[in-house]
Amino acid sequence: MVGIGIFPEGFKRRKRTFTFRRATEGPPRFGCTVEQSDRQTYDRGQSEVVLPPFRASLDRSVLITSREMKLVDKTFTAAEENIAFDEALLLAAERDGDEGGFLRIWEPTDWFVVIGRGSSLENEVDLERCSEDGVPVIRRSSGGAAIVAGPGCLFYAVVLSLKQYPALRFIDRAHAHVLSTLAAGLRSVVPQIERQGTSDLAVEGRKVSGNSLRCRKDHLLYHGTLLYDMPLEPLAHYLRSPPRQPEYRNQRSHRDFVTNLKLPRKVVYQALLSAWDHPEHLRAWPQCDMENLVREKYATHSWTAQIP
């Protein structure tokens, strides 16, 4: 499978730059303020990322902590920002002692590849094709294998307090808790959905959701995907056969193993809200934590290309 014609129009991207907003723009930032000066350019080896230097300081007036879960419905422009923001929520909860947790829902507007913290780039990703097509490859802070992200794939992340849910310190219980919660929320519209493998949700034996986690001292980040209407051809185009496979996969190809929920986005979105009891919107978020993570980790070649 070669060439560009298999993909939706407009997916190809050769060079990418982005700049963060000034601190005075948009909603309040969560936990810090930012002072900007000259812009700097960082070369990840794949694409150029333009970032402003900043100095961060605590601003207690915008901290929000409670025992109620908060909803963050936010998609950023750059793939690095979106992957970093999940970790920023985890760090903010850990720093500020939040016990209610967060639910974040977002959807990519362009194609990129995400690899797990312990993934081997060469073994899991066709780097030549990604480079030719201008598709970024980003390493996340949680485990699991490589995935392709794009329009039609709804991402979610939950940050949960381990003080409120001490049993989630055990990884198997964390998987069971979050996946059973997700499945319960989706079952009214997808009766056949079930947990498969360690961290998948499947319908009639085909994967519709992959998930991974990361633990800190007092909080858990659990995040994953829900495919509802994503073209599946890019999976085989950009990914190699994974070195680790769940038993239920039975050596099937990406195309035969993965499927979509075939539901409208709004239906899947509402099912996610229902699963987590319709949390209230967060009025401020840890934007400068995210910016710092992008600058120091997610936009760097040393992080993405590290050898596990």
Label for each model-derived stretch:
Residues 26, 48-50, 58-62:
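Targeting/processing segments of secretory and organellar proteins
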Residues 63-124, 128, 132, 140, ...:
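Active-site loop/lid in soluble adenylation, ligation, and acyl-transfer enzymes
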Residues 1-13, 20:
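Extreme N-terminal basic, low-complexity initiation segments
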